[in-house]
């Protein structure tokens, strides 16, 4: 080696010093004033911004700025720790919260910060999605024009849902709202729809049973579960729906179809009320802060159908809300009804009578879903909802002993047959071809002479034959009619 051509050590250092540029780095530091109930009050941090991340010196504490006053900064804790106390230094990171996103989250169970809860590896951080961001611009949106098949006879025909729609599931506790949402998720198998199921404030047993049901139906292959249990910090309960939305939003912007279930937003609203009261914000109606409507609209407006120029992806939202004694006119339910594109109302009296799913047709509506229905389904369902509502009115008269003519008696019998057809067991989504088959059979009068107790067996026979046939939604109606007639006569 020729040492004479090698620069000396001193020469190297001299060149390095010439290239060095002195820069002043200013960092803020605050100090904890008090800690309690998941809230941290901090003195200092004059440059703090809402939603900014804060950490302690040893990074044992992660918090988020939630409230600003002239003297103090109010932050919500996102990690439980006993090391935090008055006087602990706190530093801002000058960035907002984000979560890992992408296909590697499929089949995973995570918390709102992206930490694994299923014992698996930490999700990769190559792709990050902001938890809170602006909804897509109006010019970047498209009309809801493609159906999202739910596998439910009542929804796919009478209350249709389109991709990019926001449909509220509302009703008292224990009436089957979550079961219907799980049915819809299970029905997306092989339909190229990625699902995100967000569990907010649920018991450990409920979380466990939900995950087991998804595993049993092989639905976890295309689903991500975001969990903030009832025992979690209020800050995590608040962030859970935004985390689920960020995960689905990433796929939507890639041109994919996604479905998000928020189970449920009652717990989310309660956690936000708790945080707001602890931070001494002025309470409003039912002690909720004044911006609770903005909170939920900001979340749900991110669900949409993007225009072809933006990739054509969609995010369908199914928020769940709990009522008390069937009262829809309380604060949070009325807010969400006005934000969403329709609601599916679950009635306790229907549940008690054995009509499952206990959906009240008279109070349920889909404002934009009909435009997304397949032409064949739309044509066959036609006036079915109106006819069913008229049947319910007629049936009410029979309870008072009113005499009805033959035409009305026939209408009542046909309505009772339809009611029996619409019954469906939990966790048993049905293919859309079967939906078309029973619609044609009903409209052609193939059920008119059947006893009500025979209806389930007839439907099972049709379902079995559908799986073995080559018929599709695009097949001619006469071909469907001929095939159904042969199945029922065999």
Swiss-Prot record:
NCBIfam families: atpA (TIGR00962), PRK13343.1 (NF009884)
EC number(s) per entry: 7.1.2.2
Highest taxon of the lineage: Bacteria
Residues that coordinate or bind ATP: 171-178
An example Gene Ontology molecular-function term: proton-transporting ATP synthase activity, rotational mechanism
Subunit note: F-type ATPases have 2 components, CF(1) - the catalytic core - and CF(0) - the membrane proton channel. CF(1) has five subunits: alpha(3), beta(3), gamma(1), delta(1), epsilon(1). CF(0) has three main subunits: a(1), b(2) and c(9-12). The alpha and beta chains form an alternating ring which encloses part of the gamma chain. CF(1) is attached to CF(0) by a central stalk formed by the gamma and epsilon chains, while a peripheral stalk is formed by the delta and b chains.
Membrane topology, from the record: Peripheral membrane protein
Keyword Transcription appears in the UniProt entry: no
Gene: atpA1
PANTHER family found in the cross-reference section: ATP SYNTHASE SUBUNIT ALPHA, MITOCHONDRIAL
Pfam family, one: ATP-synt_ab_C
Protein name, as recorded: ATP synthase subunit alpha 1
Major location (coarse): membrane
Role summary: Produces ATP from ADP in the presence of a proton gradient across the membrane. The alpha chain is a regulatory subunit.
């Amino acid at each position: 080696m020729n040492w004479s051509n090698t620069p000396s050590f001193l020469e190297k250092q001299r060149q390095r010093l010439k290239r060095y540029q002195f820069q002043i780095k200013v960092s803020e530091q605050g100090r904890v004033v008090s800690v309690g109930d998941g809230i941290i009050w901090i003195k200092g941090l004059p440059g703090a911004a809402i939603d900014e991340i804060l950490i302690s010196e040893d990074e044992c504490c992660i918090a988020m700025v939630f409230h600003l006053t002239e003297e103090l900064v109010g932050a919500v804790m996102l990690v439980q720790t006993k090391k935090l106390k008055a006087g602990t230094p706190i530093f801002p990171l000058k960035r907002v919260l984000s979560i890992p996103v992408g296909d590697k989250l499929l089949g995973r169970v995570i918390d709102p910060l992206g930490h694994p809860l299923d014992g698996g590896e930490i999700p990769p951080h190559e792709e990050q999605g902001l938890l809170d961001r602006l909804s897509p611009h109006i010019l970047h949106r498209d009309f809801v024009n493609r159906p999202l098949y739910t596998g439910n006879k009542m929804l796919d025909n009478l209350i249709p849902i389109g991709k990019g729609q926001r449909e509220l599931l509302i009703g008292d506790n224990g009436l089957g709202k979550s079961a219907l949402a799980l049915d819809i998720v299970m029905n997306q198998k092989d339909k190229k729809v990625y699902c995100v199921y967000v569990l907010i404030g649920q018991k450990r047993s409920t979380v466990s049973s939900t995950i087991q049901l998804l595993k049993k139906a092989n639905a976890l292959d295309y689903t991500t579960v975001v969990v903030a249990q009832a025992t979690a910090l209020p800050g995590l309960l608040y962030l859970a729906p935004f985390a689920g939305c960020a995960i689905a939003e990433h796929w939507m912007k890639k041109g994919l179809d996604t479905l998000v279930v928020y189970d449920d937003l009652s717990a989310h609203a309660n956690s936000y009320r708790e945080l707001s009261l602890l931070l001494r914000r002025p309470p409003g109606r039912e002690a909720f802060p004044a911006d609770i409507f903005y909170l939920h609209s900001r979340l749900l407006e991110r669900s949409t159908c993007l225009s072809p120029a933006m990739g054509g992806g969609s995010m369908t939202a199914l928020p769940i809300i709990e009522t008390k004694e069937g009262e829809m006119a309380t604060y949070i339910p009325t807010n969400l009804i006005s934000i969403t594109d329709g609601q599916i109302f679950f009635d306790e009296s229907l549940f008690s009578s054995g009509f499952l799913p206990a959906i009240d047709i008279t109070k349920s509506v889909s404002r934009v879903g009909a435009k997304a229905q397949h032409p064949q389904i739309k044509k066959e369902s036609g006036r079915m909802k109106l006819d069913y509502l008229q049947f319910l009115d007629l049936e009410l008269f029979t309870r008072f002993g009113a005499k009805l003519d033959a035409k009305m008696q026939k209408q009542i019998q046909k309505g009772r047959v339809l009611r029996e057809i619409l019954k469906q067991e939990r966790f048993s989504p049905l293919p859309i071809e079967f939906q078309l088959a029973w619609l044609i059979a009903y409209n052609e009068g193939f059920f008119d002479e059947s006893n009500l107790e025979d209806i389930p067996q007839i439907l099972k026979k049709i379902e079995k034959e559908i799986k073995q046939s080559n018929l599709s939604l695009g097949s001619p109606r006469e071909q469907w009619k001929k095939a159904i007639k042969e199945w029922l006569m065999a």
